[in-house]
Amino acid sequence: AAKLVPAIRFVTSDTGIAAAKVSAMLEGTQHPIHIGSCIAVDHRHQSKVEDFEAALDQLFAQFGDSVARLQKLLDIHLSYPVNAMTRICKKLSLPKKAALEAIGMFEMAYGGGTATAHDVFMAMQEIPYILKSDHAPEGKMLVVEENMARALTLRWGDYDLAKAVSY
């Protein structure tokens, strides 16, 4: 297993949305794992360093929360992990082609047994890697990463159903 280390990403835009965004992630896999939502600091009205400090305080609180949620996924055992992954990808409106590719890779790797929600969440991290490999625009990548981070807040047992699901 890869050793994951905390990281922070700052994103600014000089067109459209006049805000800087800061988000928490874990690095150590082929593509960083986005955990938690982006926190925006409006910079239209000459934001000060203090505004960014407040955003970072909020980010660090959220980061601790998200890491705890990620750890809890280790305790959630899924009887039908492929079905759960498919339902969760669909619920999060993840790009179908990349999601189906990641689901197929997970299905081949795990071989039809049970898995933890953590295993499925980590398998879902192939999706941004696939999109990046296909040269998806940065804006789309940010939306997908934020949507994927929402998986940490879902009730995984609700998606662990025997009935097959189509995407």
PLM features per residue range, with description:
Residues K3-Y167:
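Intrinsically disordered, low-complexity regions enriched in serine/threonine
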